[in-house]
């Protein structure tokens, strides 16, 4: 989706997450009406936290363990700012340097009691602008990518600012049907 320069901010990302989460809750409500064995488990609101804040909460845990602990506690979590190094010197998770802005991206995670896991339902982000792209290419050790056609178009500011992401269709089906696997 094309956005304005002013919309390249945390508030816009969080508003987008809230919109997606509202649809997830409506879908769960519908499924609970249709199927007797399905109960609503998603909390009313999604909990927002950065990877830095999460590492500060659980400094002795792995990134996946941190996701599990916070998601089990909160029910639904928007984990933001994925891709850069944390205070520990490691990344929470890898992200391409020329895709999402690492300061403006997020995963939607829900606690899934059927498998006792943190289940990622969506990954999204405001895409890199010139400054974020150059910084992230440098941090990733691949500044030469700045000469590739797509990356050059971002640097030359000939492409619009955008936000995008994906929904894990199989995971969504598995979650809403309360199944251990789909397929």
Where are these regions (language model features)?
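A translation/RNA-centric and nucleic-acid-associated enzymatic feature enriched
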Residues: 52-183
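A conserved active-site cap/scaffold subdomain adjacent to cofactor or substrate pockets
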Residues: 9-28
């Amino acid at each position: 989706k094309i956005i304005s320069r002013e919309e390249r901010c945390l508030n816009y990302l969080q508003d987008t997450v809230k919109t997606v989460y509202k649809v997830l809750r409506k879908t769960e409500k519908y499924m609970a009406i249709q199927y007797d064995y399905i109960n609503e488990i998603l909390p009313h609101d999604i909990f927002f936290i950065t990877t830095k804040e999460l590492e500060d909460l659980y400094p002795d845990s792995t990134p996946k363990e941190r996701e599990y602990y916070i998601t089990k506690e909160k029910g639904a979590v928007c984990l933001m700012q994925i891709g850069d190094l944390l205070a520990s010197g490691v990344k929470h998770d890898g992200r391409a340097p020329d895709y999402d802005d690492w300061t403006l991206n997020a995963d939607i995670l829900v606690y899934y009691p059927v498998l006792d896991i943190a289940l990622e339902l969506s990954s999204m982000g405001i895409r890199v602008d010139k400054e974020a792209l150059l910084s992230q290419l440098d941090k990733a050790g691949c500044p030469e990518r700045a000469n590739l056609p797509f990356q050059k178009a971002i640097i030359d500011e000939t492409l619009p600012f955008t936000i995008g992401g994906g929904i894990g269709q199989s995971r969504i089906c598995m979650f809403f049907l309360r199944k251990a696997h789909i397929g």
